[in-house]
Amino acid sequence: MKSLLFMILTFFVIDAGIAQTLKGIVYEIDENQNKIPLIGTNIFWEGTQIGTTSDEQGLFELEKIESDPLHLIVSYIGYQPDTVEVPLEQDNIEIILFVNRELKEVVVTGTSLSKYFDELDAKPTEIITSKELLKAACCNLSESFTTNASVDVQFQDAVTGAKQIQLLGLAGIYTQIMLENIPTLKGVTNTFGLGYVPGPWMTAISVSKGAGSVANGYESITGQINLDYKKPDDIERYYFNAFQSSHFKTDLNANAAVQISENLSTLLLAHTDFVTKTFDDNMDSFADQPEVKQFNFMNRWHYQSFAGYESQFGIQIINENRNAGQISETHSGGHSVHPYDINIDTDRYELYAKNGFVFNDEPYTSMGLILNGQYQNQNSLFGLREYNSHLRSFYSKLVFETKTADEVHSITLGGSYVFDQYDEKFNGFNYFRKESRPGIFAEYNYSPIPQLAVVPGARVDFHNLYGTFFTPRLHVKYGIDENTTLRISGGKGFRSVNLLAENMNYLASSRQFAVINNPTYEEGWNYGFNLTRYFSINNRDFRVTADFYRTDFLKQTVVDIDSDVRQVRFYDLDGKSYSNNYQVEIAYELFERLDMMAALRYSDVKTQYGDKLLTKPLANRYKVLLTVSYATEERDWLFDTSFLLNGDGRVPSTIENPVEYQRPESFSEFMNINAQVTKKIDVVDLYFGVENLLDFKQDNPIIASDDPFGEYFDASLVWGPIDGRKFYLGLRLSVL
């Protein structure tokens, strides 16, 4: 750790030297042919991380590098990026950016958008930028969706602090999570994996509903979440973030980028977070949050040959220790009983390499090779229950892409190979599984006019345990007019079941695991549509988005906690299992620098449990979200607030328990309010905020907390917040 800190400090004192300066201005041309300065345009030298952004007048200054000719890359959300050749002797330049031909409905009024829909993608993809992520504490991925209506995040139990996302009303195991299009956070990583992604490392999150691209595998049933991390050639050179909450959580992040040569650059990212003090506000003898110590390190490299070859490669190392459970002894018959302790130790290593080749004689043809290896070792103890897991995973993909010069036709072909080895031990039993699955895929994109794109795709995978999987998918995008876009999608998905790893929350209970049918894989169809419409009100865009998605399972492993209060049963679906998800969202700039977003989402999710078709337990039926953001004229003060109304839902029956251990069979709606104030001082941001302002907490979330080793103990029936109101403050330093 000392060596790491020394390296980071060394990078901060590297002198860039003295160089000539290029001065310039970036603007657009409005309807009256007036020049309008663009604020916050990204400007950097090609193949380097040396860059800057334009100021309030569209002006910028940038030191020249030793290259002749110089190539300047200029980009701005909603506009066509440009690469400008700058003669070495030129010291001043004017740059004009033009609105993207397929983004005519997006009006950018002097500031970059913090959240927007990718109008070029046939899939309905929402881009959450780093600007949006900064509107909340966002210490890790689980805290990155507080201003997003599509994705829910909730606690999995009342003791470990584990969180899980939900998309289209279904658990996160049906959503494929990727790191820059490489599958990650799967299998045994699923339970605590959201905490392994530091918020300050991310530059954007892409959320796609429905069936994803076949090029990324067959796992996405409800959607895909793709994470973009900071890169060695980004314009940010140094970054530091410090965060402290009133619940005794400390979060520290630092990263430094170094241009080693014209072709090679590297980025070091370091993260640590720790909670060293517990508390018990509801007086049930259990800590309301776990003690956590995490160390997270990543080293990324980027090589650019400028001759058609590009490579990115890196390594990530994670060590986490998590302690939870009782913080005071219980008493039985006048004698003290040893506290119920939970200990979870995790070591995780991940390597990746992405290689791209562009053929000089075929400028519209490219080939890519992606390699990824993961290893994770986790040892855990829940009271008297011991659970240990090991994951060894290898992923490779070779992809070939070509398109016609007019971009009417393009095709993507490729093959992949995935190897996963799971070794799980639970209460003396060993669950060992090796999965080997080569696959091939093809995806065709037909776009005869800019308003229309039809993308059919299919893949075939050969699973060593479960046979052949055929995965067809289709995406269609049609621009009804310049302000209205309709997207339709449909497709099949598969996933292997990891019975223990995906249900660790039930280890924090006395429920016995009853496996009626050995789990294998799950199979489902997803289909739906997304309609986006822009209206012009007071020369500002009023966006309305409506979508509907349905998921039908053909094969599913049912997790039943209704049939027996002392068991969690696993068996094959015999009947219906589906999800209908409806969502409407509006977004508008009420007046200059005051942005508003409001959304309503309703989910109808039912599964056959024995002879009963029941609503999914412990999940809200609807969600209402309102976010308001305001910036002062100088944009040195930022104010962000979110109001979230969580709807009611069903609680599994506890009628078999003694009266004192019974719970109502439903929960009521509740409100959650978050707010944050940010002060910008040159390269420093100071921020202060509050989460769960109304201090709402689920009453008595742990059943039989006074007898944790008894037969009725259950900490898994969680539907609301466990800890109450939380204040936090922090500091961010970013040097370009």
Regions found by a protein language model. Give the residues of each.
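Short, acidic, small-residue-rich periplasmic hinge/interaction motif at the N-terminus
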Residues: 31-34, 39-46, 73-79, 89-134, ...
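Short acidic/polar hinge/loop motifs at secondary-structure boundaries
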Residues: 60-63, 164, 182-209, 297, ...
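A beta-strand signature from Gram-negative outer-membrane beta-barrel systems
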Residues: 93-95, 196-237
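Extracytoplasmic beta-strand/coil segments of soluble accessory domains associated
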Residues: 142-183
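Flexible loop and strand-edge segments within Gram-negative outer membrane beta-barrel domains
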Residues: 274-296, 302-367, 373-392
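Membrane-embedded beta-barrel scaffold of Gram-negative outer-membrane proteins
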Residues: 366-380, 479, 487, 520-572, ...
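Gram-negative outer-membrane beta-barrel transporters
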Residues: 447-450, 548-552, 572-654, 732-734
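C-terminal beta-signal and adjacent terminal beta-strands/loops
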Residues: 596, 645-654, 678-736
